[in-house]
């Protein structure tokens, strides 16, 4: 399942076989474009998520605290923290909300004529989907294109258990989990419940701030 770069093509009713196609990062975003070699999938050994860094995302509906696991996703956590520390996520909106799937953000702001893509400022990163962390409810993971090593700034939070997104998933690559919600899961549930049109919130849910916390 890949998350497509085209923002409005996600179907409103999702079967398990099509849901993966919605996790692609929307927009240009500066991802890698090299053709990957075909992987030989082997299911990673599950690991316990360990919190090494903490981030608070303040949204227009409340705060979401994240515990990030640099022990198992060092590249992904370092990348996410760069965007947080740069203030990149301020005024970003949740551009995709699918109640029983994910809430996704990290690539769009609200302009006068609709959503405006915010170009990623760092190169795409290596995919760490084989780290043994699972796409369970409340975990945060990176969105990407169909190219495995293409994640930049866009992320999603799982609103339900989405183990079909784990490596190898249907595309052979999976999606990299790098943390979990430690406080504010009720805010995630508020976001997942907002009214949407073509999986885009009718009223913006905006990230007001994102910062590292003790």
State the predicted function of each range.
Residues 2-5, 9-11, 26-214:
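Cyclophilin-like peptidyl-prolyl cis-trans isomerases
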Residues 20-23:
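Bacterial Sec-type N-terminal signal peptides, specifically the leucine/valine-rich hydrophobic h-region
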Residues 11-18:
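Sec-dependent signal peptide hydrophobic core
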